[in-house]
Amino acid sequence: MPVCHYPTPIMLRALLLSLTLITGLAQASTIRQLPLSLDTDQGTLYGSLLVPQSDTPVPVALLIAGSGPTDRDGNNPAGGHNDALKKLAQVLARNGIASLRYDKRGVAASSQATPDERNLSVERYVTDAEGWGQQLKRDPRFDRLILVGHSEGALIASLAAARSGADALVSIAGPAYPIGQVLDAQLAMRLPPAQLAQSRRILASLIRGQEQADVPEPLQVLFRPSVQPYLISLLRQNPAEAFAVLEIPALIVQGGHDAQVGVDNAEILKQANPDAELALIPGMNHVMRITPLPWQEQLASYNDPQLPLARALGEHIVRFIRSSAEQNGR
């Protein structure tokens, strides 16, 4: 009986599995993760640099985390462990784009830089992003700097773009409304009338730049005296205005199922800066995963690092970074 030399389905599956494993190992061996630090006036910040192997300079993305004590990987004690920024860095590296993600001052490895939240401010976060960006711009391994901000990090990216020397910017789930307006709208949906009136009194005072010592216990988590200096600095900001003055290529990425930053924010950013590209990703939520629309059905994704990022997210960002190189003539 002649021997059949045609591969059987089982053989094909085994071959494909082997090729997948070999390809994965090859990719892993050509991507290096290196520690990087930035000295500031209040201590040292620490981050992770992910660099794909290349004989020529590559683009580098500075990943800027969102609000609260969010670490370099996108994890937050209150907001879940989902590795969103770590996974985004890996996607970029597989596509030949380096990235730096870092622990914000007062967080994780950077905890000794401004350990007291009374000394935090938007301006300090912006200065940090500028410092990281300038450090990356001086590195001969990289030819372009792209700021990639998530949520509040998108505002920081817009404010830091000019002095960091950024060549392009990506806003993921970036807010557009003045922060005081956003806070008031969120509280109006959650607080009973008496507490809402108290919160509006405190908010109005903070908007005027005046701290409030008298904060009722139910509102301490948001308006505790130690966080008020930071809130005052945040309430000064108008994200749409900051985005409007960008003079570099910009991409707005927004998920259709984002329960924290609605699609209307992306539309306002686009109106503020008509030259920016807009990518709406159906089904993507605030932590960059594809989920159902109801909030209760999204909660698990905030604490699931195994859940993959929305595929379209990486595709849009990689395509933009490559096309912005052509706009910059590089």
Where are these regions (language model features)?
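Alpha/beta-hydrolase active-site loop
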Residues: 84, 117-138
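Accessory cap/linker subdomain of secreted extracellular hydrolases
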Residues: 170-241
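Short beta-strand/loop motif that positions the catalytic acidic residue
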Residues: 246, 252-254
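Catalytic active-site module of serine/aspartate enzymes centered on a nucleophile-bearing elbow/loop
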Residues: 287, 293-330
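N-terminal cap/lid segment of alpha/beta-hydrolase-fold proteins
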Residues: 29-56
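Conserved alpha/beta-hydrolase
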Residues: 84-111
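Primarily recognizes the serine-hydrolase "nucleophile elbow" in alpha/beta-hydrolase
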Residues: 134-189
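Short, surface-exposed "cap/lid" segments of acyl-processing enzymes
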Residues: 55-57, 61-92
